[in-house]
Amino acid sequence: MSDQKLNDAMQSMLAEQTPILATVIKESGMPNIGPKRSLRVYDGNHLIFNENTGGQTLENIKQGSKIAIAVIDRPNLDGYRFVGTPEVHLDGVFYDNAVQYAADNGMKTPKCAVLIKVDEVYTLKSGPTAGQQIA
């Protein structure tokens, strides 16, 4: 069994669909949610996205919030929820990756890169296993 959390099917869906990212705010527990069009697979255990606005999502991450990402393939009633630990990078290899991604995709230079260590993966496939942890 591989130690890699992100299998080929997951990586493909992340590349083809717009992931939705949620973070939890402080003690209040109020969720913050939004699409992350720059979210992509970094390697078999990490996701990465460019933070462009420096708004509530970044603030929540700086306050220690975990992160949850949902990606769905609605026509096929399939999807995944990834739960992970985010790290903010203002320079170095991860930031360089974000800058290059922005340049390659006609985006503004990001304020920072957010690298997410995937801790858990859940299936969102319709049926009796929906919501079960798979990695």
Task: Please tell me what each predicted stretch does.
Residues 1-135:
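Binding-site signature for planar aromatic cofactors or substrates
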